[in-house]
């Protein structure tokens, strides 16, 4: 199964990441976890179409995501049902996700199963407190996303 993961960001006029948008969601067990925009690519759907659909579904129609002309992911994430060398888990399935850093310029209002969208600085988003709120290894995906944008050099 192929998925897309999108880390929404706000950038300054030079293109540097100033804020990261993290969704807060409740698990079926009642735990609160941080997450990104994510979802599967439907049959006969393009990657670009899947990204736009999930960004609108999770952030609202006025988020105004800025997809790059070339959709090269910052990583290809492989999720396994049990712990593995990838560090990423999804107890439901073995899945592959193309992960993107996507600038958004509009008004974001979380929809679907998200309780809130928090805009944090990269330092805040990488703090141990926030990192602990991710499940399935997604905190490591955030580190990779920000590293791909030159953060932490």
Residue ranges of model-derived segments:
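Nudix hydrolase/Nudix homology domain
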Residues: 28-34, 93, 97-153
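Short histidine-centered catalytic/ligand-binding loop motif
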Residues: 35-45
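A structural signal for the main folded, soluble domain(s) of proteins
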Residues: 7, 11-12, 17, 56, ...
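N-terminal strand-loop-strand
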Residues: 1-36
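Active-site segment of metal-dependent pyrophosphate-handling enzymes
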Residues: 60-108
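Structural signal for conserved beta-strand scaffold positions within catalytic alpha/beta enzyme cores
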Residues: 22, 75, 119-121
């Amino acid at each position: 199964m192929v998925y897309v993961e999108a880390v929404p960001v706000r950038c300054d006029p030079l293109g540097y990441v100033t804020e990261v948008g993290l969704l807060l969601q409740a698990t079926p067990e009642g735990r609160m976890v941080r997450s990104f925009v994510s979802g599967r690519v439907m049959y006969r759907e393009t990657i670009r179409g899947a990204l736009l659909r999930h960004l609108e579904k999770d952030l609202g129609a006025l988020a105004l995501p800025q997809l790059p002309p070339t959709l090269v992911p910052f990583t290809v994430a492989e999720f396994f049902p049990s712990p593995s060398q990838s560090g990423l888990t999804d107890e439901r399935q073995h899945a592959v996700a193309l992960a993107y850093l996507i600038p958004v310029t509009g008004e974001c209002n979380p929809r679907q199963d998200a309780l809130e969208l928090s805009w944090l600085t990269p330092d805040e988003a990488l703090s141990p407190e926030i990192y602990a709120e991710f499940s399935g290894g997604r905190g490591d995906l955030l580190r990779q996303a920000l590293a791909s944008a030159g953060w932490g050099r």
